[in-house]
From Swiss-Prot:
Name the record gives this protein: Phycobiliprotein beta chain
Gene transcribed to yield this protein: apcD
Cellular compartments annotated: Cellular thylakoid membrane
Source organism superkingdom: Bacteria
Quaternary structure and partners: Heterodimer of an alpha and a beta chain.
Role of this protein: Light-harvesting photosynthetic bile pigment-protein from the phycobiliprotein complex. This is a protein functionally equivalent to, but with weaker absorbance than, allophycocyanin beta chain.
SUPFAM superfamilies named among the record's database cross-references: Globin-like
High-level lineage: Bacteria, Bacillati, Cyanobacteriota, Cyanophyceae, Nostocales
Residues that span the membrane, as ranges: none
Organism: Mastigocladus laminosus
InterPro entries: Allophycocyanin_b, Globin-like_sf, Phycobilisome_asu/bsu, Phycobilisome_asu/bsu_sf
Similarity comment: family membership: Belongs to the phycobiliprotein family.
């Protein structure tokens, strides 16, 4: 897993270049948002169970067919697996927020997930919607925690939804 700094260094090192103005601005932005990133992670960690529970409730309110007989979250085991997966997405999104890099999502969450879900018959659409709902809830929680700028929170959630979302082939 790389963070924003190591990713930037790697890119410039591979090119054999010194940091230019863009690199310096990128580093400056990352470090300026560092305290807020850590505060966001702290707030998410303190409320993780509630965030996952709210996400599940809202998702199942919007898509009740998921918890009806024959639905992918029908039975206690499947329902629990859905909440477990939402918890994974939240945890890894938090890592990505702190790192300022989406590498951890590629390495630990997204590689092979679409194929795994497809092979198990897990619908991708509700998963994507759940991640979007989670982003909304996280941003509300962070606003309530007094973290004024939460724009950096969008990136990992949007990245996961984009990567998992249906793709035209």
């Amino acid at each position: 897993m790389r963070d924003a700094v190591t990713s930037l260094i790697k890119n410039y090192d591979v090119a054999g270049r010194y940091f230019d103005r863009n690199a310096i601005e990128s580093l400056k932005s990352y470090f300026e948002s560092g305290t807020q990133r850590v505060q966001a992670a702290k707030a998410i960690n303190a409320n993780a169970a509630a965030i996952v529970k709210q996400t599940g409730s809202k998702l199942f309110d919007e898509q009740p067919e998921l918890i009806r007989p024959g639905g992918n979250a029908y039975t206690t085991r499947r329902y629990a697996a859905c909440l477990r997966d939402l918890d994974y997405y939240l945890r890894y999104a938090t890592y990505a927020i702190v790192a300022g890099s989406m590498d951890v999502l590629d390495e630990r969450v997204l590689q092979g997930l679409r194929e795994t879900y497809n092979s198990l018959g897990v619908p991708i659409g509700p998963t994507v919607r759940g991640i979007q709902i989670m982003k909304e809830i996280v941003k509300e929680q962070l606003g309530a925690a007094g973290i004024p700028n939460t724009s950096f929170v969008d990136e990992p959630f949007d990245y996961m939804t984009r990567e998992l979302g249906e793709k035209d082939i």
